[in-house]
A protein has these predicted regions:
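Histidine-centered catalytic micro-motifs
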Residues: 14-24, 158-162, 200
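Active-site gating/metal-coordination segments in enzymes
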Residues: 66, 74-168, 177
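Conserved, mostly hydrophobic/aromatic
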Residues: 18, 119, 127, 150, ...
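Catalytic pocket-lining loop regions of alpha/beta-barrel enzymes
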Residues: 125-126, 140-250, 295-296
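Short, flexible/disordered intra-domain loops and linkers
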Residues: 31-38, 45, 77-80, 167-180
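Mid-to-C-terminal alpha-helical segments outside catalytic/metal-binding sites
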Residues: 1-17, 24-58, 62, 66, ...
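Active-site environment of divalent metal-dependent phosphoester hydrolases
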Residues: 22-25, 74-77, 107-111, 163-167, ...
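Generic structural signal for hydrophobic
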Residues: 59-60, 119, 150, 189
Length: 298
């Protein structure tokens, strides 16, 4: 099934640029059981149910919000078969009034470029990478053909940056290396691919200052605010949101790990110019997705 937009972007209140589909339509989980348990413990999720695509869609539909949905193909590095991206795209197509699918490819597999092309043909609107889980340095030129294919399709690429809850608390972090998610590696990619829109996912602790500098320096680089409640944002990031990052920051939760209602409540408690809110919650995401920003009549 091919995805096409069915969203009334003028009517929705927010675009969450960062949500995970944990379980595919076949009941397969995106991580193995040990990693699932550790991740849920890290985020203090308790009995919160795993999110399938249809459940996620209804959750956002009830809140008049749109969700970008994805999974992560890290089979080579993690030894765990990924969720079906075709299943995710089909689920987004069923719920195209509220969901936007991003693709995923394993950069370490020879068919990565071909997989990009296949998923573009199915209608994905961007691609998600997790360098630490996928065990690759984004600025290694071996992976540049992947970015060439994404750039040629006119789509954005979203990269995990900074600390990760995946593997946290386990011996050796389950083998996951944080250095792959240093945003300075993406500075190289952004310079070498000026026509590729890049989103750095999460406040990139412990590299937040570098992340702010990169987003401010390069017009093709944005950052999303997922993975943390806004009340835990580093103070320099909060300052930047009202200044140099007001047109570069995107609303994102990391759902189901961070719930939308909690994130919005904590964001509203920040001392920010009210004019910044519509930029972060919707308008900046529309620009990243290559969509027009609706104007309000009157």
């Amino acid at each position: 099934m091919t995805y096409e937009y069915g969203i009334d972007f003028a009517a929705v209140e927010a675009i969450d640029i960062h949500t995970h589909v944990e379980v595919d339509g076949h009941g397969h989980n995106s991580y193995d059981d040990e990693l699932v348990d550790a991740t849920r413990s890290y985020f203090k999720m308790g009995d919160t149910a795993a999110a399938g695509v249809d459940e996620l869609a209804e959750h956002y539909r009830q809140r008049n919000a749109v969700a970008v949905v994805f999974t992560i193909d890290a089979e080579t590095a993690m030894g765990h078969a990924p969720n079906s991206i075709e299943d995710l795209i089909a689920g987004a197509a069923r719920n195209n009034d509220v969901l936007i699918p991003f693709g995923t490819v394993d950069p370490l597999q020879d068919r990565a470029v071909q997989r990009v092309r296949e998923q573009v043909a199915l209608g994905v609107k961007g691609f998600k990478f997790h360098p630490s889980m996928q065990a690759f340095e984004p600025n290694d030129r071996r992976f540049y053909p992947i970015y060439d294919a994404i750039t040629g399709a006119g789509l954005p690429a979203l990269f995990h940056t900074g600390q990760t809850g995946i593997g946290s608390g386990l011996p050796g972090g389950y083998g996951i290396k944080l250095r792959y998610s240093d945003p300075m590696l993406l500075d190289d990619v952004a310079a070498d691919f000026p026509d590729l829109t890049i989103v750095m996912a999460h406040p990139a602790v412990p590299w937040v200052d570098a992340q702010i500098a990169i987003a401010a320096h390069k017009s093709n680089v944005y950052l999303d605010l997922s993975g943390y409640s806004p009340k835990y944002f580093p103070p320099q990031l909060v300052r930047a949101l009202g200044r140099q990052l007001r047109t570069k920051a995107l609303f994102g939760t990391d759902y189901p790990y961070i719930q939308l209602d909690r994130w919005q409540k904590d964001f509203d408690a920040l001392e920010l110019d009210p004019a910044v809110r519509p930029l972060i919650f919707k308008e900046n995401a529309l620009r990243v997705l290559g969509l027009p920003v609706p104007t309000i009549a009157g």
